[in-house]
Amino acid sequence: MQVKFYKTADERLKPYLEGYYFLKKESLVDVEYLTFPNNFISVSVYHKVGVNFQDNNAVISQNDNLDFTSILVASYKSPIKVNYNGKINEVTFCFKPLGLNSFLPNLSVYFNSSKSFLPFDDYRETMTAILNESSDEVKIIMLENYWLSKLNDFNHFLLDNLVSEMLKVDEQVTITELALKYDTSRQNIHKLFSRYVGKNPADFRKIHRFREALSKRIDLLKEDKNLTVLGYEALFYDQSHMVKAFKSLTGFTPKQFFEGIELKNGAGNWFFTK
């Protein structure tokens, strides 16, 4: 199975779209892995592939009767076991926490929908053409031009500030303190996060700290520092707090997790089981 990740090239898209990856699986041998919570909103498109979600399991299978499939994943709190069966052709877009709102005015209607993600009239046709394109360079031009054509002027001053505050790992501001600072209520903050981010602020912060820990782990490995230092640098209160958070988000202790995960540029998304 071949996976290529690309950072967004166009400066106009960079504030909203972190990047995208192209996945090709030609072998009939099944691949299974665990993927872990993150704060991106992911949109995946497939050609001749069926996707079935049940609890914390996703089965992605070759299906020659399905010309096009598209899904949106906004939030999950525990690992998802993913099985790839047969030949797979996939493109996945990784939008920043508020990013997709700048393309869709009513994003929240898709968060809990079981229907295929088809946000625009020309979406299926364009994404199918992208999936069928053999050149990565041409694919990148096509997909970035498409998302640029859908870009709108979404702007929410309060929410932008709240998300920025939550991303500050060197400060531990409570939701109550944020409500006081921005003259709003805890309830309104929860409502805004649920509507525009797809998860509550507590989960958002916990996942962000976890992801920061993955990123910092690379630097600590270079410096030969231990996991206790990692916990402090990622703003976990103590070692037991870090262990609890890791078990909640990954199903593993930090030691087990870091022994099995492939860390590359702090991504740490996949834990292959077979």
Explain the meaning of each model-derived region.
Residues M1-D170, T174-T176, Y182-R186, K199-N200, ...:
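Alpha-helical bundle regulatory/interaction domains
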Residues D183, S194, F210:
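Basic, Lys/Arg-rich alpha-helical nucleic-acid-recognition elements, primarily the DNA-binding modules
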Residues V197-S215, A245, L249-E262:
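Alpha-helical DNA-contacting segments of helix-turn-helix folds
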